[in-house]
Amino acid sequence: MKKITLSLSLLALSAILIQCTPAQPETQEAVAETVVEEQAEDSRILPSWNDGRHRDRILDFVARVTDTSSVEYVAPDQRFAVFDNDGTLWSEQPIYFQLYFALDRAELLGIEHPEVALEGGYGPLLDLFALTHTAMTAREFDGIVTAWLDTAKHPETNKHFTDMVYQPMLELLDYLRANEFETWIVSGGGIDFMRPWTQKVYGIPPQQVIGSSVQTIFENTGDGPAIRRLGKVDFVDDKEGKPVGIQRHIGRIPILAVGNSDGDLQMLQYTASNELTNMQVYIHHTDSVREWAYDKDSHIGEFHKGYEYALDNDWIIVDMEKDWATIYPE
């Protein structure tokens, strides 16, 4: 009887051990499959970005601030990401695209030699903008901008200006919004020049666009109530103006800021002051073949002080030539 009982006990113990012992080969295969799946999933995120430290840091940042179990978690209602436009979301060489618009408008209006304003400094440029951007209603200006973008092409690339947006940045915008970030434009360009098309091109609605502006007034016209654009500057959203514009329109300090020039430095510094986990990214124009290469000596998008500051503070400096597999959408 004791022998039978002992045998049964040994059988029971063997069964328990068999059930509890992990199937090593199957477990290793499962782990390998999981790794492959994760790598495949990761490759579908930001596909126009080459693998490397900069892409990894961006993905890691988003993972940390969206992980509810992390001490660095940031609630969705505080996930604000701000982007410069010229040179950050679309190209800006050899002159800002809005200047092409102003020159075309000047020709249409019969203004002689408007190109002289490009060499005359800040004052003549303001005069050119006053002549070409004002003395009309906001609705009229909206229509003029839209019609121009439908037909105008860049003189060097022969592309429509809205086809000269950066594919990697479009992917980054989509990726952030998929992770419940609110994406904003904070640009030195005209706020009313950008608003007609940012929703279609970037997925950023007009109410999430901050830019430079002219003074406006309300009036009743024969066509009904309207906002009229005046020939005086109201706000310049550049350099120190960018944090001011962010406070006026957003009312919160962002946790992510992306720019490309010294004019964006204060916006990135302001974002770095957030007590929440934050990130600063600079886009460095290094690709003379697929776009333009320029930085500290450029008349457009000068990148000198910002570059040195970014190095000192371990901010991301994206190298367009090395980090981006594609520049423009195909």
PLM region descriptions:
Residues 1-4:
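Positively charged n-region of N-terminal signal peptides that target proteins for export
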Residues 6-13:
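Sec-dependent N-terminal signal peptides
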Residues 16-19:
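C-terminal motif of bacterial Sec signal peptides marking the signal peptidase cleavage site
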Residues 24-45, 49, 56-59, 63, ...:
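C-terminal cap/substrate-recognition subdomain and adjoining C-terminal extension
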Residues 64-70:
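A short, compositionally biased domain-edge/stem linker segment
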Residues 71-75:
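Short loop/turn motifs at secondary-structure junctions and domain boundaries
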Residues 76-94, 268:
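Asp-based phosphoryl-transfer active-site loop
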Residues 94-95, 100-163, 167, 171:
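A metal-dependent, Asp-based hydrolase signature
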